[in-house]
Each structure stands twice: as structure tokens, then as C-alpha cells.
Amino acid sequence: MDYSLKVYYKKEDLPHLDDVSFFHNTYTFDLYKNLPYYTPLMIVCFQNGEPVASLFAHIMRINRFLNTSIFKRCYVSQKPAYYKENLPEEDIFYKLMNTLMLELKHKVFYIEVRNLGDPIFGYKAFRDNSFFSIKWMNIKNSLQRKRNIWNQLSRSRKNQVNKAKRKGVYIEEVTKESELPTLYKLIDKNIHWKFSHRFPPYIYFENFFHSYIVNRKGKILITKYQDKIIGGMIIGLHNNEVAYSLYYWGKTKTYKNLYPTIYTIWYAMTYAEKHGYKFFDFMDAGYIHEKAGKPRFILQFGGKQHATRRWYKFSWNWINFIATKFYE
């Protein structure tokens, strides 16, 4: 079949695209509005003049003063959006990736594709474009089981949630824009440095409120104790199908015995269950062979782990060659 592909840098120029993907959608552009160091783009695949697939990516500049390609990275999250059934998805993805590589040539130093949820999806497209992979773990909770979320928790998790309840921990939703500055400063100050380094700037946070929370495509939950914020979570909501854990945090040192992170995650999962969502997706949770840390922590909420991959490519061939040899 003959396909034509086009790259778009502005939301206003896009054709009409159905809302079939949380990550590859027209409103995803709104997240990067007024962000000078981020450049969103979308590749749309057409068949007979009609869109059949799209792939969203964003370029991030890590240096505020230098604008050369060495300080730019490109990220893609999740499989592309497909707008028709029975499409040759792998073939279309191959064309999307080839177009992305041509578009990014000499523009970025590093490309990362993550949260695919399938270790073999796009394998040929990645290999032919000289990507290397690292095995990762995806964790997802089904909210359609006969056992509800509470009964999926481990015994220790149940005890921790009950203890937090007894001590007066509670959850509130962020519904006013005026609450955002204080909340953002709190997050940036208290979460782990490595996590904070990846946390987006405040304007992104503000854009999420206007584009997602106002339109019921997302929630910001804050966990409180004695009117003090001790944790929280940002979740993305897609068509009553999937709730995505985008970010979560908690003052686990100061309020260790109140289990703020555990209580927040439990509440968010319960919220998704009560509102008819089918899955709660933690996405890429850690390395496939990692037995402790984040993967073990999340698995105690009753989810299932699935093998997946993250794909990487450096624009400098010799670095890419060394990285490929090291990781594979």
C-alpha cells in the first residue's frame, strides 16, 4: 500500500485526528505551549489522503544558552496511534521511524523510545535505524478482576494503608490553578534529585492543568496530614480505559510512619477502579532483572509485570557503537 507521511510542528496545522491514544494526540501539543526549551512534533501517516496513524515526539534542549544539537534530546512514548483496524502496524511504524530519523538528522544528540509495552514491537524499524535496547519491566494492574484493588494488595500494604487512615491521612484533588505554584515548589524540593532532574518545568505543570484537568483527561491528587501536603500523584486518564501513573512522590523520610506514597498510589488505583477504568498502568517501572527498588515496591500493589524494552540511539556513531556493545 502507498502511504504518505508529513511532519507537523504546530497543532493548528494538524488534520482531524481521533482521540485513540493518550500520548499521540493533538492535545499533547498543549503540554509544551510557551516552553522555549521544548519542541513538540507529530508525524502523520496518510492513506488516500486520510490519516491512518500518528507518532508524537518532543525535542528537549538541556542547556538554556547553547542551541546546538549536542544539547538536544528527543523522546517518544508508547506505540503510535492507529486510526483504522486491520492496518499493517509494523510496516507503518517502520515508515514513521524512518521519517522521524530523517527529520532529526543533525538536530539531536540522543533519541529514546520508551513505554512500548511489547519487547518485539518495531524490532526491525529500530535495528535498521541503528538503535540499541535495554530490557525493562512494565507493570500494569487490571481493574476488571473479580478481586477488587483492596484484595490485590499484599498484607503489608493493607496494614500500611489502614495505619495511614487511622492517623488521619487524606486525599484532595487539585481543582484551582492558584494551588499549583506552592504544590510545584513542594514537589521539586522534596522528591529525589534523580526524579526531580527529569521533572518538567512549572509551565508544563500549568499546561497540564488547563489542557488535561479542566478537560477531565487528568488528575493531580495531593495527600495531606494535618493540612500539610505529604505526597501526591499526577495521573493521566484516557477514555475510561486506562489510568496512567505519570508522576508520584511522597515525604517518605519526614513522614515515614504515615506511608504517604503507598497511601497515594492505593487511593489513585481505587479512584480509577470506582470510575470504571479497565487498567492502571505504571508503564516502565525499572530494569527487567531489578529485584528491589521501584519494581518490587509497585508489584506489592497486585499488578502484573511484563517484559518490554527501551530503545536508544546516539547521533555520534562511535558512541552509539560502544553503547550497543556494552548493553547488548
Language-model features, listed with the residues they occupy:
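A conserved beta-strand-loop-helix scaffold within acyl/acetyltransferase catalytic domains
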Residues: D2-F65, N115-N138, K146-T254
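Aromatic (often tryptophan-rich) hydrophobic motifs at membrane interfaces
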Residues: P51, Y82-L87, Y94-L102, F208-N317
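Conserved acyl-donor/pantetheine-binding loop and adjacent beta-alpha core of acyl/acetyltransferases
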Residues: I59-P80
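Short, solvent-exposed loop/turn segments at the edges of secondary structure
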Residues: R73-Q78, I134-W136, G293
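A gly/proline- and charged-residue-enriched helix-loop-helix capping module
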Residues: C74-L116, I120
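Short secondary-structure transition/capping segments
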Residues: K124-A125, Y184-L186, A292-P295, W318-I322
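Short His/Asp/Glu-rich catalytic/ion-coordination signatures at enzyme active sites or charged loops
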Residues: S142
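Membrane-proximal basic amphipathic "stem/tether" segments
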Residues: Y312-E328
